[in-house]
């Protein structure tokens, strides 16, 4: 049994690619938790997609035993957290389970937008933050400049920042000593009623749902009857233990410790992340603070390219939902694309990852419709409904006004690219809140409509700043806006999958963009095809695909002109009839390209 004073719970916060998972690997190696032959890169990133993209999606935990220079053995619980904004709720929960953080900053790149967001999360959670400068072995490293930047931008004292290179292993011992000496030990009472914070949960085919917890008070034992305070569901603990990263079973988890338990729980949806686990017979009076259900921010339609894959898609979504409770879906039908699902995500990266996992792990070929955000529609009869799908928008005559979500975005950019970045934000209806400088980098804070960001804001930002700008956002509030639904008509038939909601000022340009793209992609027919963008009954943009023409007069040599005229008139009649009854088949490739985001 480890004394409370010998336990340290910490997480590592960093921007993507600043070396967080590599540092975790080195700490695991230095404490001898894994033999050298079993070591692999990004030890804690369990999904292939996490390893390939170099990002952490699910929070993971590992217990390390470290013999410090003072001769005592300390139990270090490392919580590896996601760094990306879409998983900000996972970050805030992981931080609530710890008392301190290592702030990892790349010594060549300096402070980035997500570094800021995550550090503020850590400071809000009351953490002791230890700055760590990584990649000091790089020729481009400028540790002194970056130290100054951390002091200017974040306000942390960097006089005793730890200098390391996680890749080569320089300074790892200093990090371990800093953890022991500078971070506070956890507090807790083993005799109080059980209070454990549910940090994460995932589905294991053999054990059912594995639940990751941090014990605040009381003791969690094998065979104990427990209750979830948010859902009021009761279970019996089958097994409990911890990860080193290998799974090790024990009989109990005590205050200050992090570990897991299993309890014959069938679905991850039954375990709400951030919930409090307590004893069924002797429950705690109050749950631990900070629980909030996660709400999808971005919605889009997923349709199988081959209609026969519909059942497989449904089963695959159900399996993914077992592991990711923040992801939601409901069945949807589209006249153009057939049967599919309307899915809700935490953000664009979350959407990409789910789509990639469906294609990779379940071998599905999918079409994704353009992502849309959740609008609030206030009707004239006083009702308010949330709109996930542009096709479901009520008749404009019944709408009083609409509201759209706005975000607070933080953009870090080298000052030579600041002009184009500010122009981009203004084009996207942004309102500047703040602009500050730290050395040669500027930090701009803007309020932006989320609708303008989901299309291609991130790609545009990266291209105008040559990849140097970093971007982070949080959903701020809803505000009233002049929004309209743009329908795309092909040969006077509306194509539901291509309709979208947009601000009135941008409706024409966005509609024209899609019409132009479809004109290039739909094959020519024997009759003229009109592609139109309409707001209600008013056409705002139109492109025409001219008809293929067969030369019907080719067989006439000389002779009377009336013969030719008769043939041409006959052809004209036929074309007219075709235009009336002809159906235009839009090929899949045209759909995919038209749905590719962007205003081009």
From Swiss-Prot:
| Bilayer disposition of the protein | Peripheral membrane protein
Q: Please list the residue ranges annotated as the tr-type G domain.
A: 5-187
Does the keyword Nucleotide-binding feature in the UniProt annotation? yes
Sorted alphabetically, the Gene Ontology cellular component annotations on this record are:
plasma membrane
Q: Which CDD domains does the record associate with it?
A: EF4_II (cd03699), EF4_III (cd16260), LepA (cd01890), lepA_C (cd03709)
Q: What does this protein do?
A: Required for accurate and efficient protein synthesis under certain stress conditions. May act as a fidelity factor of the translation reaction, by catalyzing a one-codon backward translocation of tRNAs on improperly translocated ribosomes. Back-translocation proceeds from a post-translocation (POST) complex to a pre-translocation (PRE) complex, thus giving elongation factor G a second chance to translocate the tRNAs correctly. Binds to ribosomes in a GTP-dependent manner.
The family this protein is said to belong to: Belongs to the TRAFAC class translation factor GTPase superfamily. Classic translation factor GTPase family. LepA subfamily.
Instruction: Please give the name of this protein.
Output: Elongation factor 4
């Amino acid at each position: 049994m480890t004394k409370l004073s010998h336990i340290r719970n910490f997480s590592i916060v960093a921007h993507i690619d600043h070396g967080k998972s590599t540092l975790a690997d080195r700490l695991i190696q230095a404490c001898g938790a894994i033999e050298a032959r079993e070591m692999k890169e990004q030890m804690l990133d369990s999904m292939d997609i996490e390893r390939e993209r170099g990002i952490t999606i699910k929070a993971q935990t590992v217990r390390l035993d470290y013999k410090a220079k003072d001769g005592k053995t300390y139990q270090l619980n490392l919580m590896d957290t996601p760094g990306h904004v879409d998983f900000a709720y996972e970050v805030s929960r992981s931080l609530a389970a710890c008392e301190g953080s290592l702030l990892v900053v790349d010594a060549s790149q300096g402070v980035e937008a997500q570094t800021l967001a995550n550090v503020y999360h850590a400071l809000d959670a009351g953490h002791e933050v230890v700055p760590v400068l990584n990649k000091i072995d790089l020729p481009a490293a400028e540790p002194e400049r970056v130290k100054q930047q951390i002091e200017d931008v974040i306000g942390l004292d960097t006089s005793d920042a730890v200098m390391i290179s996680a890749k080569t292993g320089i300074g790892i011992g200093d990090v371990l000593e800093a953890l022991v000496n500078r971070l506070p030990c956890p507090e807790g009472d083993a005799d109080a009623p059980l209070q454990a914070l549910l940090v994460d949960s995932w589905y294991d085919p053999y054990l059912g749902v594995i639940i990751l917890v941090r014990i605040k008070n009381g003791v969690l034992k094998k065979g104990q009857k427990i209750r979830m305070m948010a859902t009021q569901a009761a279970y019996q603990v089958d097994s409990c233990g911890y990860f080193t990263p290998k799974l090790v079973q024990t009989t109990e988890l005590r205050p200050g410790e992090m570990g897991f338990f299993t309890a014959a729980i069938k679905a991850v949806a039954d375990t709400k992340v951030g919930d409090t686990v307590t004893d069924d017979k002797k429950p705690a009076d109050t749950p631990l603070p900070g629980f909030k259900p996660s709400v999808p921010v971005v919605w889009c339609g997923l349709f199988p390219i081959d209609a026969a894959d519909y059942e497989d898609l449904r089963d695959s979504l159900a399996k993914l939902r077992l592991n990711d409770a923040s992801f939601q879906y409901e069945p949807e039908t589209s006249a153009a694309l057939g049967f599919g699902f309307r899915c809700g995500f935490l953000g664009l990266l979350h959407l990409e990852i789910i789509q990639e996992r469906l294609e990779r792990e379940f071998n599905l070929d999918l079409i994704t419709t353009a992502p849309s955000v959740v609008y609030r529609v206030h009707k004239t009869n006083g009702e308010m409904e949330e709109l996930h799908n542009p096709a479901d928008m009520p008749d404009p005559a019944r709408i009083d006004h609409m509201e759209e979500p706005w975000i607070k975005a933080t953009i870090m950019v080298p000052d030579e690219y600041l002009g184009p970045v500010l122009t981009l934000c203004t084009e996207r209806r942004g309102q500047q809140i703040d602009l500050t400088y730290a050395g040669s980098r500027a930090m701009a804070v803007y309020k932006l409509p989320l609708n303008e960001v989901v299309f291609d804001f991130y790609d545009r930002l990266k291209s105008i700043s040559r990849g140097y700008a970093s971007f982070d956002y949080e959903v701020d509030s809803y505000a009233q806006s002049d929004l309209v639904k743009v329908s795309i008509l092909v040969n006077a038939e509306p194509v539901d999958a291509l309709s979208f909601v947009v601000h009135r000022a941008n409706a024409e340009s966005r509609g024209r963009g899609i019409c132009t793209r479809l004109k290039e992609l739909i094959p020519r027919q024997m009759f003229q095809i009109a592609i139109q963008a309409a707001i209600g009954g008013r056409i705002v943009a139109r492109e025409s695909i001219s008809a293929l023409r067969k030369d019907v007069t080719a067989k006439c040599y000389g002779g009377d002109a009336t013969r030719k005229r008769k043939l041409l008139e006959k052809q004209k009649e036929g074309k007219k009839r075709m235009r009336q009854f002809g159906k235009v088949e839009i090929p899949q490739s045209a759909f995919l390209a038209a749905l590719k985001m962007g205003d081009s």
